[in-house]
């Protein structure tokens, strides 16, 4: 996949992460776009603080770029405690996790990103730590090996994943709070873009913010990335102010259309439409035809196309919808067995 894909929801570098951190909301009051999640977390956090207890272990899942890491930081800040961050792939050995757990203070939040990628060995250590606040570790090797238990202070594990279905049942069942993040509305994204412009001192008109939001695929990270590219365009091709016209010209230059589709999306849809007669086509066949990794298509490209109704998953594979044909101004070919042809 093109490494320069501007509308990917995956963070593409440390510089972008630093820029996103500068505009990250610091409280639930500023965490817009997920009203149900915000309401529930406010109740759970207030209740835990009222009882002077650590918040229940929390699992946050949803597509990339929707604010899982941001919510973890907000939880720690609202609870008035420190946050320690790590990720599933980093915790290769039981000792890696033990080193982190033994350095936690009472009430601390341990944030584990990509928690579905924890190794089975590390998961086994995590179970008693989550359930009983105890760490079971082995000392020595062979016949002289012995198990000792270390008491841990009450803490909150916040796990984030884009693939909740890959979590093992024992791990998933140990989370007392489970929150799913949804794609954002255009109005919510417009507010996020305007807020970022206020923080970064970028002059922007309401219509310009709305145009960026409309093409951001319901994802704040993409909205912020598009905003930076539109700002570049406005400074070079205009007077620095982001108007609706400037935003449209900049995004057209980036080949991001009015529905947020880019070249990769259009190539996938075009392949199904013209090489596979609209589908259905198996994922592996589609990946081979596009010279892409099937996992990348399934995890990165497809979710938005499915959510927007451009493709559907069937038992026989992927197929484009009538909405996709209409978007490209094409007539769906009549197939054998069709009773209706709209």
UniProtKB/Swiss-Prot annotation:
It comes from Alcanivorax borkumensis (strain ATCC 700651 / DSM 11573 / NCIMB 13689 / SK2). DNA binds at residues 313, 318. ATP binds at residues 23-24, 65, 68-70, 131-133, 174, 184, 221. The lineage of its organism: Bacteria, Pseudomonadati, Pseudomonadota, Gammaproteobacteria, Oceanospirillales. This is Holliday junction branch migration complex subunit RuvB. It is found in: Cytoplasm. Residues 185-255 are annotated as: Small ATPAse domain (RuvB-S). Has 3 domains, the large (RuvB-L) and small ATPase (RuvB-S) domains and the C-terminal head (RuvB-H) domain. The head domain binds DNA, while the ATPase domains jointly bind ATP, ADP or are empty depending on the state of the subunit in the translocation cycle. During a single DNA translocation step the structure of each domain remains the same, but their relative positions change. InterPro entries: AAA+_ATPase (IPR003593), AAA_lid_4 (IPR041445), DNA_helicase_Holl-junc_RuvB (IPR004605), P-loop_NTPase (IPR027417), RuvB-like_N (IPR008824), RuvB_C (IPR008823), WH-like_DNA-bd_sf (IPR036388), WH_DNA-bd_sf (IPR036390). Homohexamer. Forms an RuvA(8)-RuvB(12)-Holliday junction (HJ) complex. HJ DNA is sandwiched between 2 RuvA tetramers; dsDNA enters through RuvA and exits via RuvB. An RuvB hexamer assembles on each DNA strand where it exits the tetramer. Each RuvB hexamer is contacted by two RuvA subunits (via domain III) on 2 adjacent RuvB subunits; this complex drives branch migration. In the full resolvosome a probable DNA-RuvA(4)-RuvB(12)-RuvC(2) complex forms which resolves the HJ. Residues 1-184 are annotated as: Large ATPase domain (RuvB-L).
């Amino acid at each position: 996949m093109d490494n320069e894909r501007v509308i990917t929801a995956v963070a593409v570098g440390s510089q972008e992460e630093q820029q996103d951190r500068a505009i990250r909301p610091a409280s639930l009051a500023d965490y817009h776009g997920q009203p149900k999640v915000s309401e529930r977390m406010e109740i759970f956090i207030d209740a835990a603080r009222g009882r002077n207890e650590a918040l229940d272990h929390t699992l946050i899942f949803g597509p990339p770029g929707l604010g899982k890491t941001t919510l973890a930081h907000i939880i720690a800040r609202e609870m008035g405690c420190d946050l320690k961050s790590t990720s599933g792939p980093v915790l290769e050995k039981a000792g890696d996790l033990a080193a982190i757990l033994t350095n936690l203070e009472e009430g601390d939040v341990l944030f584990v990103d990509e928690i579905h990628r924890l190794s089975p060995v590390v998961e086994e250590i995590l179970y008693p730590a989550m359930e009983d606040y105890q760490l079971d570790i082995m000392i020595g090797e062979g016949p002289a090996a012995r198990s000792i238990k270390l008491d841990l202070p009450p803490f909150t594990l916040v796990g984030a994943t884009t693939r909740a279905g890959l979590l093992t049942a024992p791990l998933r069942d140990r989370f007392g709070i489970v929150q799913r993040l949804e794609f954002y509305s255009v109005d919510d994204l417009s507010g996020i873009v305007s807020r970022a412009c206020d923080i970064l001192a970028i002059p922007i008109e309401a219509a310009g913010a709305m145009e960026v939001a409309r093409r951001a695929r319901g994802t704040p990270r993409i909205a912020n990335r598009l905003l930076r590219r539109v700002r570049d365009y406005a400074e070079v091709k205009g007077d620095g102010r982001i108007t609706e016209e400037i935003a449209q010209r900049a995004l057209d230059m980036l080949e991001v259309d009015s529905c947020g589709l880019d070249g990769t999306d259009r190539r996938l849809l075009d392949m199904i439409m013209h090489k596979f007669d609209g589908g259905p086509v198996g994922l592996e066949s589609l990946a081979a035809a596009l010279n892409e990794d099937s996992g990348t298509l399934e995890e990165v490209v497809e979710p938005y196309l499915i959510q927007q109704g451009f493709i559907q998953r069937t038992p026989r594979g992927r197929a484009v919808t009538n909405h996709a044909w209409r978007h490209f101004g094409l007539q769906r070919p009549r197939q054998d067995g069709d009773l209706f042809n709209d």
